[in-house]
Amino acid sequence: MYILVWKKGQQIKTFHTLDEAAQFKAASNIDEAQMFSVTVAPAISASGGSNEATNLRRLMYLSKSTNPEECNPQFLAEMARVATIRNREIGVSGFLMYSSPFSFQVIEGTDEDLDFLFAKISADPRHERCIVLANGPCTGRMYGDWHMKDSHMDSITTHPAMKTILYQIARSFSSMWSYLPKSAGNMLLLGKDPAAQPPEPMSVVVTFIYLVEFGSILSNPNLTDQAAEVLSTFVDVCVKNVEGSGGNIAKFITGICMAYWPINRTEEALTAIQQISEDLAQLRSQQAPGSAVSLMYSQAGVHYGRPMLCNAGRRKSDFTLLGDCINTTSRIATLAKKFKTPLLFSQEVRCLLRDEMREEIVGAGMHQVKGRDKPVVVYQFPGPELDVEMVRQKIEQFTPGRFRCQMPVVEYEGLPNSQRPPIFDDTPKANRRPRTPGYGGRQRSDSQVDRPIMIAKLAGPSVSATGDTTLTTLTYISQATRPMSRQDLSAIMRTATRRNAQQSITGTLLHVNGLFVQTLEGPKDAVANLYLRVRQDPRQTDVTTVHMAPLQERVYPSEWTLTSATAEMLATFPPLQDVLAQLAKSFTSLETYVPSTVVRHLTAGNNPRNLMPVSCGVVMLATDICSFTSLTEKSSLTEVWMICNTFIDACTSAICQDGREVIKLIGDCVTAYSPGNNADSAVAAAQELFTFCRQLREAFVDVLDVRGCVSCGVGLEYGQVVMAQCGSMGLTEYVVAGAVSARVMEVEAITREVGYAIVVTEPVADRLSPQLRDHGIVPTPQAIEGLPCYGIAGEEFELDVDSIKRGIKALHAARSGEKPLTEPEAAKPDFRVSPGRVRHGDSGRRSNSAQGKRSIQVR
């Protein structure tokens, strides 16, 4: 059932389907409204908060007060008194706890009662952004005697740890919500952990909407400072039309929007994509001279399929669609460029249209696309052509003049250290994690590996011998790996008191029902080193930083303390442990979906909305699974999910070290960046990843398992990128965009042709160490846009794609009981380059000479 709430909660209407709710909203011309999906089951109405009701549900949510100044204990007491009277009548019990400016509330009752009450709560103007922390069935009431008794934090305890911890976790959780994929957000609103959900097959219409020639905009030095504004405009236009037509934004990928609709909204999908083009045309006509928004055009491909909606990855996660139809949609979008049309869609999409719309379309023929054996039949709407070459010429000839945009991009290196956004995770070299392929140890990554140093902009190589002694506070949460007795807690306190006093560290450790929440105060270096030791402690796992920032004066006394919540505070307010445990659990889950730069900026006590758009030079990395379509076309959805999760986790384990960051997870493709002065480290990560794939194949060599056929190629390219925060309509994206983003995908693609698993371009080769540059790379017969490319030398890094393909065919044949086809050995092309062609010095390669470029075959 779906509930539509409008007029600030005064009007509520229920519907059986989402279509009915959307149609009513459109027909009634309702602008500001909220829609909720609920499950209703027959239930006996509760009465008076008694514990005799059946089919009960418990819902916990977090919200932020719109007027925290008036929320004193007296105000909350009166609000709770009124709520108690009203909620007793409908049989709802629970509690309300307030810690400025956040409210934590639990309500218990039947499905029907909670759905009605929560709809009104969500529309209450006294608070905003109601985020569900838990929502599920319960066998009885935990708070039947409380009804809606309030508890202002000042009434519960004066202990500073509780106030600080609740505020820091709630603030970070609330701020990260807008970066969460909508599909994952919907799961959390239903009280479910997205990472724990099994893959769900869906029949959907998928689209890739391209911002035409966005790479040319990025390549034009006169337009670099407007790139963030162009992207933000594109995000807002896509969000408005996609979500306004009943669709869902899957992700944004450097000037590309991936979205999907249920199949019963196919016509709305095509109309929304056309409206995006019309909106951009209107924006172009309204721009002042010199605005790059006047160069924005869209081009899209649409396809129907049955992918699965699932969580991909664990340390770095994405809740998205996976399936062969996603790749086909991307190929159709590429065909739109050839036909000079703003919208191209497949025969499968045409079959979902009604006769009226079918009469409007025209056929565009049958075409072969990459990764698909059968050709695709495509259609388009008649109308004006969209000439991509014309758009490129306009961009190349464009001059902004004196125009000044609202979101100017600044050079990262030109900013003072204190103003630089934390785009790199600057982990101290002395504390590097051991390199282990695959999943590594049991400890999870803390926002992609030990981020506390960069969070507070701790000292780098220029630190003096005594270290940075600036007073700093750090709060983290973790889960105990085993039950902790009073003796265990006493032992922890004795050890911590002795060691921390020597380092001038004060603070508190709170233990709540298996959850550790610790705050440390002291010199920056001492706090950071202690935190890194804590992460290796086998008594706890899932260690996650909540807050780290400079401190004016110490909050805690000189004697370090440990507080057991069950002993003191919970005796006054028992629900407190539920709030802390659930909030910490939800925060840990949410943090893996949010860009690492945003998390570091947020946990340093900053507003992520204030992240400054910057441009800088980085080494870009792109990798994906070889012959992924062939491998998965005859595999089950569960196997596809398993392959992607295994590969993505291996990528994050190899990549997320030494300042490298994962940018996007796109099906089986992973993109990342590394500091421009750390090319050797990027190559080492690529070697680790390819080694993992080889070891994985060896582990399943005698088993009919798809993991026995997993291999990958890795491309590395250097170039300038723009890093900026985009979007203002409820969905926020932190993007890393540049012409290098497209080139690195081409570099990765030629690994299949040249026989090397790792290929780097000349700008990357120039940044390698002398040893690796002169003795570890080999010229390849391919080039990208005139740039010579080089493979990483060594037999262990050769890529035999034909062997991989034969293995995939043999696997599918063995599973189906068929005899695999054999190919004559003479017919097998060999793209491998002899390992003996190792480059020495600069012979055979000249960085900038025309002669050197002409000697390489250009793709």
From Swiss-Prot:
Residues 414-449, 813-859 are annotated as: Disordered. One of its GO terms (molecular function) is blue light photoreceptor activity. One of its GO terms (biological process) is cyclic nucleotide biosynthetic process. One of its GO terms (cellular component) is motile cilium. The keyword Transit peptide does not apply. The keyword Repeat applies. Keywords: Cell projection, Cilium, Flagellum, Repeat. Pfam families: BLUF, Guanylate_cyc. Residues 846-859 have a biased composition (Polar residues). It comes from the Eukaryota. Residues 815-831 have a biased composition (Basic and acidic residues). PANTHER family: ADENYLATE CYCLASE, TERMINAL-DIFFERENTIATION SPECIFIC (PTHR43081:SF1), ADENYLATE CYCLASE, TERMINAL-DIFFERENTIATION SPECIFIC-RELATED (PTHR43081). Belongs to the adenylyl cyclase class-4/guanylyl cyclase family. This is Photoactivated adenylate cyclase subunit beta-like protein FB. It comes from Euglena gracilis. The lineage of its organism: Eukaryota, Discoba, Euglenozoa, Euglenida, Spirocuta. The gene is pacB.
